[in-house]
Amino acid sequence: MSTSAPNTNELNSPVLETQPLAGDAALLHSSIADGYEEIIRAPFDYLLNLPGKDVRSKMISAFNQWLCIPADKLEVIKRIVMLLHNASLLIDDIQDSSKLRRGLPVSHHIFGVPQTINAANYAYFLAQQELPKLGDPKAFEIYTEELLSLHRGQGMDIYWREASKCPTEEEYFSMVSHKTGGLFRLAIRLMQLASDKNCDFVPLVNVLGVIFQIRDDYLNLQSHAYTVNKGFGEDLTEGKYSFPIIHSIRSDPTNIQLSSILKQRTTDVDVKLFAVECIKATGSFEHCKEKIAELVAEARQLIKEMGNSVPGSAEAVDRVLDLIGLEPESS
């Protein structure tokens, strides 16, 4: 009995290829997916509904006293930043093995890691979908640049932690400029794109980003309110090289106690209290306060140099500094 070879035309037939859905079928599948929107967004919406200070939105409003962009574009930028900020928190909490966020269980402990990662990634693209409303294709370029910057900074931070490598202060500042500064810069660059004012606030925003992060690092180890919201000394449990920890380790390289505690990822309160005393003994908390004061002075100097091009700048920068938890200095 003879057998015939397969017909190559049949094997290559378009019938065997996946065809795009058309007409009613496409609408049906779209409708089904739309019905899952709340489920897909659930980890994100849970985080969004937790009480927060909404600092970034308030800062955008404060800077708009100078940039005066139209209200509709201002709301678009606020939405973009809100989506990105909360998406990054979802990912941060997973990468840091966090347990609490704003005093309640983190999203991935409720919805699971896979669903939470998907919700965070979904939010990145919801934010990107807002960009055409700004009416300038350069918005996509800014968005991509700053998201790449944010992920570079996050990668540096994670590497130091996982490799138990204590960075220098200069490396820390570079990381913060990318990670924390990225979202601040994204907001201000999109605002400048939408404004007819000729002001460059990026240098100021870079300084504010560093102030914000050092303050956060300080409060993580010294604030009762922070303990309630995120747990006591969470940075120690994460093994994170925060600003006071970096200063303390580098102030006394022969003392390996603090670096050893970081490697343990301890949840023991007594061990963490001992670590805080080690940090205090090297004057590292005072160093934080001194560095913040120095950076606040630098921010004020940047405003001063802008001169008359930014009317009312002194009062506005006080409001911005106040928003990130610093009392305005008396002049």
Swiss-Prot record:
One GO molecular function term of this record is:
dimethylallyltranstransferase activity
SUPFAM superfamilies for the chain = Terpenoid synthases
Q: Which residues form the signal peptide?
A: none
Q: Which InterPro entries match?
A: Isoprenoid_synthase_dom_sf (IPR008949), Polyprenyl_synt (IPR000092), Polyprenyl_synt_CS (IPR033749)
Reactions that this protein is recorded to catalyse: isopentenyl diphosphate + dimethylallyl diphosphate = (2E)-geranyl diphosphate + diphosphate; isopentenyl diphosphate + (2E)-geranyl diphosphate = (2E,6E)-farnesyl diphosphate + diphosphate; isopentenyl diphosphate + (2E,6E)-farnesyl diphosphate = (2E,6E,10E)-geranylgeranyl diphosphate + diphosphate
What EC numbers are recorded for this enzyme? Answer: 2.5.1.-, 2.5.1.1, 2.5.1.29, 2.5.1.10
Q: Give binding positions for dimethylallyl diphosphate.
A: R101, K179, T180, Q213, N220, K230, K240
Name of the protein in its database record: Geranylgeranyl pyrophosphate synthase dpmaD
The reply to whether Signal figures as a keyword in the UniProt entry is no
The free-text note explaining how the cofactor binds reads: Binds 3 Mg(2+) ions per subunit.
Task: Indicate which residues the UniProt annotation says bind isopentenyl diphosphate.
Answer: K53, R56, H85, R102
Similarity field: Belongs to the FPP/GGPP synthase family.
Residue positions annotated to bind Mg(2+) 2 are: D92, D96
**For binding Mg(2+) 3, which residues are annotated in this chain's numbering?**
D216
- The top EC class is transferase
Q: Which UniProt keywords apply?
A: Magnesium, Metal-binding, Transferase
Instruction: From the UniProt record, give the pathway where this protein acts.
Output: Secondary metabolite biosynthesis; terpenoid biosynthesis
UniProt-listed Pfam families = polyprenyl_synt (PF00348)
- Amino-acid positions noted as binding Mg(2+) 1 in the UniProt annotation, renumbered to this chain: D92, D96
Its cofactor is: Mg(2+)
* Biotech / industrial applications: Diterpenoid pyrones display various biological activities and subglutinol A shows insecticidal and anti-HIV activities.
Q: Describe its function.
A: Geranylgeranyl pyrophosphate synthase; part of the gene cluster that mediates the biosynthesis of the diterpenoid pyrones subglutinols A and B. The first step of the pathway is the synthesis of the alpha-pyrone moiety by the polyketide synthase dpmaA via condensation of one acetyl-CoA starter unit with 3 malonyl-CoA units and 2 methylations. The alpha-pyrone is then combined with geranylgeranyl pyrophosphate (GGPP) formed by the GGPP synthase dpmaD through the action of the prenyltransferase dpmaC to yield a linear alpha-pyrone diterpenoid.
Print the organism lineage.
Eukaryota, Fungi, Dikarya, Ascomycota, Pezizomycotina
